[in-house]
Amino acid sequence: MDLSPREKDKLLIFTAGLVAERRLARGVKLNYPEAMAYISAALLEGARDGQTVAELMHFGTTLLSREQVMEGVPEMIPEIQIEATFPDGTKLVTVHQPIA
């Protein structure tokens, strides 16, 4: 399989997001990289499913709560920016204060 660097990045985000999802399902609090991967993977999948940038900006704030992450993680993530592929091209999605 010959993947471009961008495709490799997306695959890495998805894989890390899947690990974070499994840990969350077991009740494990997520650390910084896991929280970033979990939210980023969900945003990429949402774009692939046809959600708009505005919908994803809101959706990104509903994925994790303070109770689901380790202490200090919400303050470490004031925003998340990710380039997602939409039906009409690639766009930057920015989610402010993703962990409420």
Swiss-Prot record:
The record ties this protein, via SUPFAM superfamilies, to: Urease, gamma-subunit
Q: What class of enzyme is it?
A: hydrolase
Give the pathway: Nitrogen metabolism; urea degradation; CO(2) and NH(3) from urea (urease route): step 1/1
InterPro entries found in the cross-reference section:
Urease_gamma, Urease_gamma/gamma-beta_su, Urease_gamma_sf, Urease_subunit
Q: What keywords are annotated for this sequence in UniProt?
A: Cytoplasm, Hydrolase
Give the matching Pfam families.
Answer: Urease_gamma
Q: Could you give a single Gene Ontology term from the biological process aspect?
A: urea catabolic process
Q: Where in the cell is it found?
A: Cytoplasm
Q: Name one GO cellular component term.
A: cytoplasm
* EC numbers on record: 3.5.1.5
Q: What molecular functions are annotated in GO for this chain? A: nickel cation binding; urease activity
> What is the protein's given name?
Urease subunit gamma
Q: Which organism is it from?
A: Ectopseudomonas mendocina (strain ymp) (Pseudomonas mendocina)
Instruction: State the encoding gene.
Output: ureA
